[in-house]
Amino acid sequence: MKLAYEIKKEEAVIRRCYDYGSEAELPEQIEGRPVTELAPYAFSAHMEEGALERDIRQGRLRLWDSCGAGDGRAEEFPVSGGKNLPPALTGTGLTAVTLPPALRKIGAYAFYNCSRLRYISFCGELTDLGAGLFTGCHAIRELELRLDADGASCLREILIEVPEKLTVRLEGSVKAKLVFPEFFEESVENTPARILVIHTHGSGMNYRNCFYDRKFDFRAYDACFYHAKAEEDFDTVLEMTLARLMYPEQLLPEGRAAYEAWLREHAGQALEKSVDSHDMEALEYLAGLLAVEERAEALLEQAASRAVSLEFPEGVSYLMDALHRRRKERREEKREEAETTGKAEITEITGKSKSRFEL
């Protein structure tokens, strides 16, 4: 990977990325200086190439090469066509990007029309987001945010920019996995008043407002669960529920009870979906949660049969093992119950005999 960059006030600003791949992992430093800014239209195919060429000719831009030693090496930018330069990583060519920890600013329309971009990793230091940053980026599905001890970030601003359903992984000072449902806004004309009224659909906006002072509020997120149950499809609610239970960062007892109650109510469907998606992590969690249920054996048998039909050997193996353990536990419970009942009957008979003797 090669980067066109410039140095401003002892900090590196990335102007363009060149690579044969589809994923960009930007360096923390260039020439020993922290990378703090991504220029406008940096990953967009709509950048005015004339301006870029002019900066090249004037010597304002240099080239960073990831193949160099250490943090890469700085080179003079090849002005005449750049025969050794990979194609610009822009537009539909970009699928994932990892931003450096010191990055504070992203210029306007930096990812404009990157329609295949699915994954973005960034840090809490990022505070300045340009206009139209994710315009045309409708494929984004996953965000990873690395937080420092303060916990503040620009996550809400990014969530508002991307209305589609998103999975967010929090790392650093907190570790959590969160699912934010989609939302969309509709303009409805109020003719008598001569105004347009904005109607918001979906519970996604409720969840995107679970922030206070740029910090995520887990309690507010969990309090919105009734919105999701009423407005979202089963798959989305299942993803949200499993994410909170499997990564229970700051999950209060009442929140856990609400999620577990919903999961037990839809246990069969939840197991079925986990088998269909070959999700071993979810399958193991569900099997453990439902192990104490009276209908656990029937649920595990159904899930195992489905795993067989879908040619999911790892799932079949785990489910059969869980079923074996459950049956063994049931046999032990029945044996203990029988022993307890037998002892009670013996005690009762002994007591009656003793009473007759005393009389």
Question: What residue ranges belong to the model's regions?
Answer:
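Structural signature of tandem-repeat unit edges
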Residues: M1-E11, Y18-T36, E48-K105, S115-D128, ...
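A cross-kingdom feature that marks long, compositionally biased intrinsically disordered regions
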Residues: Q250-L252, R256-L271, V275, A304-S309, ...
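Ankyrin repeat arrays, specifically the small/polar loop and inter-repeat linker segments at the C-terminal end
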Residues: Y259-E265, A291-E301, E314, H324-K334
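Conserved hydrophobic site in ankyrin repeats
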Residues: Y285-L290, L319
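Charge-dense, extended regions
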Residues: S305-L359
